[in-house]
């Protein structure tokens, strides 16, 4: 009888825990995805802060030339970064217990791999948690779908690209200048500016910001005033009110006359779907572009594509970009390569005699 009572008590405790985890009444929803999200993001954040402040230099290229990234080793907020795991480690899973000592683990850039893998798990779980909360509340799932765009982008630069290139040392450093270095080297090696998927991403980001500004300004300019001119129009809105807060007909009429009639949405649902889909699809394409360039399916190459009747090259902007790419490529990892890959790949002409 005692055993039966204990089993009921433990089951009751588990049920209460499940109810608490999945309760939508909590100030912050936890959810089953949150059970994994919270420890992974806390770990990634904690290690990032500690490493950004105090991590010793890392041998990123695997040639015994450590690169300093932390504040205590001479960097500031702009130049500091978590240096990627050493090329000597490659794609190997490199937890602390795989190193002979903590000093070796730090020298080989172990914190980068720890942070990145925990971070990617955490943001994926955050996306799952968005879906989970939407499901509990009876909402549609599109919030999580929208968030999948930045998740895909982060996964592309922190995981897919290193896998394609064969080493975590090719991943994006976790810092401001490190991000810029990653972008410059990526352009030099993959000509990303000439990749159509990157172009779609640019259209998505800039177009999304334009449409967001247009929508916000149109709504703010067509509010239905419920107050006198002596007080703010915002005071006329009550949270949860049933009435429309702005006049979509007026906004539609204004914009339709400013551009042309069919450039303006007259359906609020279609409008907001478009506002969400435009940047999300653009960033999806950019993440897909990074993931294909990871395996060296690079941007368009129009180098020396225009020649005169004598066979002499007439430079186009593509050739100017190519010259810049070569310059950037010879300057990065200066002591790891004798020549940029584009030059080293060309077979030398044999000399007889």
Swiss-Prot record:
EC numbers on record: 1.10.3.9
NCBIfam families from the UniProt entry: psbA
Binding annotation for Fe cation: 215, 272
Protein's organism: Cryptomeria japonica (Japanese cedar)
Residues the UniProt record annotates as site (Tyrosine radical intermediate): 161
Entry protein name: Photosystem II protein D1
Residues noted as binding chlorophyll a PD1 in the record, renumbered to the chain: 198
Entry note: cofactor: The D1/D2 heterodimer binds P680, chlorophylls that are the primary electron donor of PSII, and subsequent electron acceptors. It shares a non-heme iron and each subunit binds pheophytin, quinone, additional chlorophylls, carotenoids and lipids. D1 provides most of the ligands for the Mn4-Ca-O5 cluster of the oxygen-evolving complex (OEC). There is also a Cl(-1) ion associated with D1 and D2, which is required for oxygen evolution. The PSII complex binds additional chlorophylls, carotenoids and specific lipids.
Protein's membrane topology: Multi-pass membrane protein
Residue ranges annotated as propeptide in the record: 345-353
């Amino acid at each position: 009888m005692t055993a039966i009572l204990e089993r009921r008590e433990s089951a009751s405790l588990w049920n209460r825990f499940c109810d608490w985890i999945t309760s939508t009444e909590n100030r912050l929803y936890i959810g089953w995805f949150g059970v994994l999200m919270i420890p992974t993001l806390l770990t990634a954040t904690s290690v990032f802060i500690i490493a950004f402040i105090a991590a010793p230099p890392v041998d990123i290229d695997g040639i015994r030339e450590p690169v300093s990234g932390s504040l205590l080793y001479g960097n500031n907020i702009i130049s500091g970064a978590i240096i990627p795991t050493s090329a000597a480690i490659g794609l190997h899973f490199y937890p602390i217990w795989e190193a002979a000592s903590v000093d070796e683990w730090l020298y080989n850039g172990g914190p980068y791999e720890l942070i990145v893998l925990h971070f990617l798990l955490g943001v994926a779980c955050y996306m799952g948690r968005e879906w989970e909360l939407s499901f509990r509340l009876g909402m549609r799932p599109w919030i999580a779908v929208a968030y999948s765009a930045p998740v895909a982008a982060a996964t592309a630069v922190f995981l897919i690209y290193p896998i394609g290139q064969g080493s975590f040392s090719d991943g994006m450093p976790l810092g401001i200048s490190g991000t810029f270095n990653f972008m410059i080297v990526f352009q030099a090696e993959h000509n990303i500016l000439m990749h159509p998927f990157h172009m779609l991403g640019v259209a998505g980001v800039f177009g999304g910001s334009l449409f967001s500004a247009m929508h916000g300004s149109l709504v703010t300019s067509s509010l239905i005033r419920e107050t006198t001119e002596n007080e703010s129009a915002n005071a006329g809105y009550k949270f949860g009110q049933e009435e429309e807060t702005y006049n979509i007909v007026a906004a539609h009429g204004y914009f339709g006359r400013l551009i042309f009639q069919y450039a303006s949405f007259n359906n609020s649902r279609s409008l907001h779907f478009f506002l969400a889909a435009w940047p999300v699809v653009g960033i999806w394409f950019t993440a897909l572009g990074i993931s294909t360039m990871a395996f060296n399916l690079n941007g368009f190459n129009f180098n020396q594509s225009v020649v005169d009747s004598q066979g002499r090259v007439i430079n186009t902007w593509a050739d100017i970009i190519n010259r810049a790419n070569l310059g950037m490529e010879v300057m990065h990892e200066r002591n790891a390569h004798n020549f940029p890959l584009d030059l080293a790949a060309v077979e030398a002409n044999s000399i007889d005699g």
